[in-house]
Amino acid sequence: MNFEQARFNMVEQQLRPGKVLNPDVLEVLFVVKREEFVPPAHRRLAFADTQIPLGEADGARMFSPRVEAHALQALAMKKHENVLEIGTGSGYMAALLGAHADHVRSIEIDPQLADMARANLARAGVTNVVVEVGNGLAGSPAYAPYDAVMVSGAVPAVPQVLLDQLKPGGRLFAIEGAAPVMEAVLYTRVDQDFRRLSVFETVVDSLRDAAPAPAFVF
């Protein structure tokens, strides 16, 4: 399989028509090799518009390329920023975040997936991502505040404890709701308040242990 041609087709046939137009986002999708983070059994589907299974680990699946790209575009990260990811999975989103940011701390609840992600990141030469095992829905307050937080899985509502770990001007991307009605949202911290913007509708797998939690109240 010609992965470079498949990567080009993904960008030109899926992402640009879907209004992913930020040149920095499109560039990093060519630099970070998605196929290297996909389990070998599913590598031929690396650029398909689908959620790819990550083996037998609790049924976890990767976001589709379209959701990944829109999330990066919404966060609009800068090179100096400190980023937190909740739900490492294969490590691919962490690698994308790391290509845009100064440092990424990614928390994965499944030790098997955390090991997979560390191996994938090391093989890809990513050195500014740290993967920890734990329940990321509480965030990582010891290393807060963060310029950006990426929640790589659906939650019923974003826990306030995650929002509180944002810097002023910090952004948090998440997918809220329950199938079949989910909404990708971007929160921005403005002093002690939080602005919520609806980005798009989608359906993705929920984070493990993502039980209903206290959420941001307008």
Where are these regions (language model features)?
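Class I SAM-dependent transferase core
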Residues: 1-84, 92-95, 100, 113-127, ...
